[in-house]
A protein has these predicted regions:
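Core segments of small alpha/beta cavity-forming domains
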Residues: 26-97
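Surface-exposed, charged secondary-structure patches
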Residues: 67, 71-144
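Low-complexity, intrinsically disordered terminal/linker segments enriched in charged
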Residues: 126-148, 156, 161-202
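Bacterial Sec signal peptide processing site at the extreme N-terminus
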Residues: 20-25
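Bacterial N-terminal signal peptides that target proteins for export
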Residues: 1-7
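Hydrophobic/aromatic beta-strand elements that line small-molecule binding cavities or substrate pockets
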Residues: 119-121, 148-155
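Hydrophobic h-region of N-terminal signal peptides that target proteins for export
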Residues: 11-19
Length: 202
């Protein structure tokens, strides 16, 4: 009888242990899961660089990593881009640099063509989203330059996706900006209305 009691106690402890063990690793794994779409996107970005809007073919691939909201914003900005060229058929004005000289996921000017990336850290926000900090590198091997962006990742339909990119302030960039905001500059939904509209920034 004593042996049976010991066996029963052992089985009970074992079952309770199995029931509790997965909870802690699950919390640990969430930041790692949040990094997956970020690594996927930037791996493609450095292997085949994007300037301005991705082609429809490339956008289809990149959409795997993006939230439905960000995809919608990019599509509206592309429609606004087309509307701008419709309004300027003679091409007598320079198109907004956000469309032509800007890396949507990396930054403007000499930050548009990163050649390498490294995920540095991941932080959770109170709303359940994550910020994945990525260091990007561009320039010649003997003298490259680095900068950092914060990629906002959220859960959507059971998977993590990128919802925004924050271009962080540093010694070369005076103000912080967001991709979601830059996509709306000068636009009213899919129509170009100029920099004087409520969505525009100086």
């Amino acid at each position: 009888m004593t042996i049976l009691r010991y066996i029963s106690l052992f089985l009970l402890v074992t079952l309770l242990g199995y029931g509790q063990a997965p909870q802690k690793p699950h919390r640990i794994e969430l930041p790692i899961q949040a990094e997956i779409p970020v690594r996927g996107l930037y791996r493609r970005l450095v292997s085949q660089q994007i300037e301005g809007f991705p082609t429809p073919k490339r956008m289809k691939v990149l959409s795997l990593y993006l939230s439905s909201s960000l995809i919608h914003r990019i599509n509206q900005a592309r429609a606004c881009h087309d509307d701008w060229f419709r309004l300027h058929p003679k091409n007598d004005e320079k198109a907004p640099s956000t469309w032509t000289e800007f890396g949507l996921f990396s930054g403007a000017d000499d930050r548009g063509h990163p050649q390498a990336f490294q995920v540095e850290k991941t932080e959770s926000d109170e709303d359940g989203s994550f910020r994945v900090y990525v260091r990007l590198t561009e320039g010649p091997q003997e003298k490259p330059w680095n900068w950092q962006v914060a990629v906002v990742v959220m859960s959507e339909e059971g998977k993590f996706v990128i919802n925004d990119v924050i271009f962080l302030r540093d010694k070369d960039v005076e103000t912080e900006s967001r991709l979601s905001e830059l996509l709306t500059v000068g636009s009213d939904a899919s129509h170009w209305v100029g920099y004087g509209n409520k969505n525009a920034t100086p």
